[in-house]
Every structure is written in C-alpha cells, then in structure tokens.
C-alpha cells in the first residue's frame, strides 16, 4: 500500500515541496519543523535556541495533534543544530521538559551548516499509531 500524504488544513505549506507528514504501515513521518509561528509563518523567528526549541516542539505537537497523535507516539527524533557546541545543552534542557517520564524516543542530534530561514534548530520525527 502506498504512503498517505497529509496536508493539514490551517497549517502553512511547507517551505519545501513536501507534505506535513507521510504515513505508511502505522508509522507517521513528520516533515522537519523549525521555530516559525504556524499562525503567522512570515513573522521573524524567535531569538535564541531556547525559544526556537520551544516553538519547534510546539509545532511538532500541533502537527501530531492534527493527526490524532501525541508526543508519546513518537518513536524516533532527529535534531539538527547550526551551533551544536554552543546550543546543545540549552536545547537538551528544553527538550527534556517535552519528553518527561517514560516518553524517551530514540534520538540523533547532529550539527549542520545551515537551516531554512537561518533557524538554529530543526527537528523531524517518526511516530507510531
């Protein structure tokens, strides 16, 4: 069975030619999220890694919610940081608040050269229904 692609009403289109999420065999793959305001996508990004991490995770929660899922459905996360050495600890502090208790998905975190709109962080994930 081919994947199902989700374009979610009320959310801005992706900055790339992609869907908000794709689903196959009970797995939901979220397109990378960053710190833009989903209700005002042209607004400036928040300042600093803490604020951008909060917004990024809130965006993930919103996309998952539109699909009937929660953060507890997440099995795997990939985090991309443009200032890895500088921002890793601060990002982790915010991240840990969103994945408290038993919800501890597998995670990869890498440093990258650049992200869309000069974002400091981008996160994508795989969730399971």
Feature map (PLM): residue ranges:
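N-terminal presequence-like segments and the immediate start of the first folded domain
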Residues: 1-75, 81-129
């Amino acid at each position: 069975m081919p994947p199902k692609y989700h374009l979610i009403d009320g959310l801005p289109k992706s900055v790339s030619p992609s869907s908000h999420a794709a689903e196959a065999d009970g797995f939901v793959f979220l397109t990378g999220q960053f710190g833009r305001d989903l209700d005002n996508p042209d607004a400036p990004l928040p300042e600093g890694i803490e604020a951008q991490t909060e917004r990024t995770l809130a965006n993930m929660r919103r996309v998952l919610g539109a699909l009937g899922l929660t953060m507890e459905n997440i099995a795997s996360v990939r985090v991309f940081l443009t200032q890895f050495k500088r921002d890793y600890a601060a990002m982790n502090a915010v991240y840990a608040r969103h994945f408290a208790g038993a919800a501890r998905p597998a995670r990869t975190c890498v440093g990258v050269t650049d992200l869309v709109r000069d974002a400091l962080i981008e996160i994508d994930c795989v969730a399971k229904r």
